[in-house]
Amino acid sequence: MLSRRHFLRLLGSAAVLAAGRVRAQDWEVESPVVTRMREHLQWVIGGMGMALDFRAIDQAQNEMFRIQINADNLQPVASCFKAFILPYYFLNTPVDEWVYDDNSVLYSMVVHSNNAATGVVLDNVARRVPGDENAVVKFNNFLLQIGLSGGLHSWNWEGSPTSGLTDPRFAPSLVNGRVVRLRGQAYQVDNAFTAADLARGHDFITRGEFFTSSDEVREALRLSKELLSIPSTATGYQSPIERVFAPGYTGKDGILPASDIQTGRVVNDAGAITAGPDTYIIAFMSAGESESVALDVLREVIGQMDVYEAAIGGTRLEELIYDS
């Protein structure tokens, strides 16, 4: 459980947000409806190479439930982590130098998922962050500050100024256990995250603006969500979650073809869906399974969101589809 008090401590540790004292309440015992939801999703995922962190936030910014299935298992991350570069950029760049229009390198990074642009943003921000560490290490330090437990090992792409830079803390290794384990095999994948970490990052983006007294921080997180919410109609591309349920989606996906990685095809998507006053954070990771199977599982996750809304007398999915 991530209570509001715990969330505030987490944000305070980042030295970027300040908030007043609030009560820690949230949930202490999993409700029967959530237990049924969790058991259903465990049955759906079974022994497949998938991981899920699925949580709900109410309008008072309390966490209503959290369902985690293989959520602490490392999986290839593809491009999902790029969502977290947005607050990293905004919180380390003077407001009068923020550039995020559709011709900017930041836009290219997050909307078009340009890998070279990602390296340029990491390099540019690192030059503003104090210390002698390289750009990959500095970004990872930010991830740790906002509550994640992992980070990038490297970002080696042609045209990227981060090529050749590494963070030894997150090097793949059979010795320290930083490997992706699928179907009894261990794979040393260069960049691996957990679904739990992806959910933590989106929790920071989703709730952070409500707990800060800084207008600058609030605007940084608001803009991060705005860029992550650019509709597929603007790009002609839909993420896996959007292909299942597009209304109210804010997030970043990542796809790797089987020819590019030894684990087999990677299908990742992480973000938030707004349903009336409630927000659902979904972090889904799949490796070695077909895209059609991954989409089927995401349909089940979205279906359980509807189950929960029905149980609490909330907003049904057909209402969201109609409103969109």
Per-region residue spans from a language model:
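Active-site SXXK
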Residues: L74-W98, M109, I282
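Structured C-terminal helix/loop/strand segments within mature extracytoplasmic catalytic/sensor domains
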Residues: D26-R38, D190, A199-G201, I205-S324
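Beta-lactamase-like hydrolase cores
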Residues: A24-N73, Q304, Y308
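Extracytoplasmic
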Residues: G47-G49, C80, F193
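Short, well-structured active-site flanking segments
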Residues: L91-S108, S113, S213, V217
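Active-site-adjacent helix/loop patches that line small-molecule binding or acyl-intermediate pockets
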Residues: W27-R38, D101-A199, F204-G208
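N-terminal secretory signal peptides and thylakoid transit peptides that target proteins
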Residues: M1-A14
